[in-house]
């Protein structure tokens, strides 16, 4: 077994990052590559609470990882420059999403985790018309639907919904307006 020579030390960021989408993922299936880059978030609603008047700002950064077979992100709220030691736990988000293309189902398998808020979800994502829709469930089994809507090269509207106990009504719990920074 050969080892990585001392002069070839690689940090996790270098080993994780990829230059672009893997050729194994058809261009027509690339529902997330347009997100690559950094975004400023205007938080409108979080955990069902209307927070628009609080002017909470966040940030999100997206990039290809795992030899281009996945798109990973980090969502941060409040943004790093505004974080303090006494952050309100109900408004604290510092989590990551891993979206991996699965050719067997012709969709993306998605795992989200926010350790700051003890929140985890598994979803399946794909194009639905002009939107990207992710369906899945929280760790407690609550069905969820997350959507990227109003997509342009420089902006998107993100909606997070949870199915109510009646099994018919979707409640809007999260809403972010995003503008591209880079």
Segments predicted by a language model, with ranges:
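Hydrophobic small-molecule pocket/channel-lining residues, especially in calycin-type beta-barrels
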Residues: 1-182
């Amino acid at each position: 077994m050969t080892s990585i020579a001392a002069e070839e030390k690689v940090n996790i960021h270098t080993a994780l990052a990829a230059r672009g989408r893997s050729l194994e993922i058809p261009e027509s299936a690339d529902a997330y590559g347009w997100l690559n880059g950094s975004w400023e978030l205007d938080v409108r609603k979080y955990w069902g609470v209307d927070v628009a008047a609080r002017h909470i700002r966040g940030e999100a950064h997206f990039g290809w990882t795992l030899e281009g077979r996945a798109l990973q992100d980090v969502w941060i709220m409040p943004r790093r420059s505004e974080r303090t030691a006494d952050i309100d736990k109900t408004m604290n988000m510092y989590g990551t999403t891993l979206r991996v293309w699965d050719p067997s189902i012709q969709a993306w398998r998605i795992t989200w985790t926010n350790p700051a808020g003890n929140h985890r979800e598994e979803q399946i994502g794909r194009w639905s018309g002009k939107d990207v829709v992710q369906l899945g469930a929280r760790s407690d089994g609550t069905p969820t639907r997350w959507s990227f809507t109003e997509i342009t090269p420089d902006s998107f509207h993100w909606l997070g919904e949870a199915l109510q106990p009646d099994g018919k009504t979707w409640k809007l719990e999260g809403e972010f307006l995003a503008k591209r920074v880079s």
